[in-house]
Design a protein with these regions (language model features):
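Conserved hydrophobic/aromatic beta-strand scaffold that supports enzyme active sites
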Residues: 43-45, 109-111
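Glyoxalase I/VOC metalloenzyme domain signal
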Residues: 1-5, 10-32, 48-101, 113-129
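Short, small/polar residue-rich loop motifs at catalytic or cofactor-binding pockets
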Residues: 105-107
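Short glycine/proline-centered loop/turn elements that form peptide/ligand docking sites
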Residues: 34-41, 129
């Protein structure tokens, strides 16, 4: 039986900052909030367009370890979100207007980092028209 992706979870030192980035810059909508004992959010779940799975932003209790991204290094390579090929220029403009530094581009993917330093890609294939 084939498996489907349920969710991807990212631990965030600054949950509110991460949520703003994914909502305001990338346009993801909040599906659900999980409260934290003592107030605030413990976790925020964000929807992805196809409704298959979700992105969970989790409050981290400790600061991140220094882990600069490097190709070929073991660990999470990137979180890739699908965009339609005809919308690529719109996304390039949106990232620039939001002050997001694009670190690399290929024929199919725009690479950048979220506020926590996680590598994110907006990707398409040539036949995604």
């Amino acid at each position: 039986m084939p498996l489907a992706l349920h969710h991807v979870a990212i631990q965030c030192a600054d949950l509110a900052r991460c949520e703003r980035f994914y909502r305001e810059v990338l346009g993801l909508a909040v599906l659900r909030r999980w409260p934290r004992e003592g107030g605030g959010d413990r976790s925020v779940w964000l929807s992805v367009a196809d409704g298959e799975g979700f992105l969970a932003l989790e409050r981290a209790d400790e600061p991140p370890e220094s882990r600069p991204w490097r190709d070929g290094k073991a660990g999470l390579h990137l979180v890739a979100l699908h965009i339609p090929a005809p919308e690529r220029a719109v996304w390039e403009d949106r990232l620039e207007e939001a002050g997001v530094h694009v670190v690399h581009r290929t024929r199919w993917t725009i690479y950048f980092h979220d506020p926590e330093g996680n590598r994110i890609g907006l990707t398409h294939y040539p036949d995604d028209g």
